[in-house]
Amino acid sequence: GTKAATYYPKNTVHEDFGTARADYNLRDSDRLSAAYTIDRGHSVIPLADPLFASALQLGAQVASLEEVHVVSPNVLNTLRVGFSRAAFNYDSATLATFPASLSFVKGADPGGIAIGGGAVATAITTAGGNVNAGVWNRRNLFTLTDGVQITKGIHQISTGIWLQRVQDNEDIASRRLGTATFNTLATFLQGTLTNFQVVPNHSELG
């Protein structure tokens, strides 16, 4: 037989941000500006199986320093130094209590189950935790720009340099909780696996 079930799981989204700016006139021909922005947020979004959710944490910050120097009435020099950092963590969250015996990996949350199809993305139905649990990334950008603007009548010439260093660290191995695939509902009820994937040892990049 079949049974219809209706769920209204709670979606939790939270975000905070702030920004600060300061300007200072060093002298008539020089102006200094500094700015900083920070943003933090997290969300818990239930999956198709309402007993499990995806947990996402985001963070970003940007700091910049600018110095504008008036060389002459027709020449302007602008120097900028900046730093930005972005980070995210993507994980699995359980919205109910499960015994340890239901986990594919010892000490971890329950993994994913797919019925029909060769993978979770093509399955008829899915259950269990997020297959991308434990994914994270950190990226730093260091930027330096130095530019000159020359104005002559209705004409303007701009030239300068732009340098940037990128630092990127990540760990994006999926299926750490394990994913079990069954061909049909009958094979699922019989406990006959078609495929099982798990990443026991993952490594960071960067």
Language model features: what each stretch is:
Residues 1-206:
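Short acidic-glycine motifs
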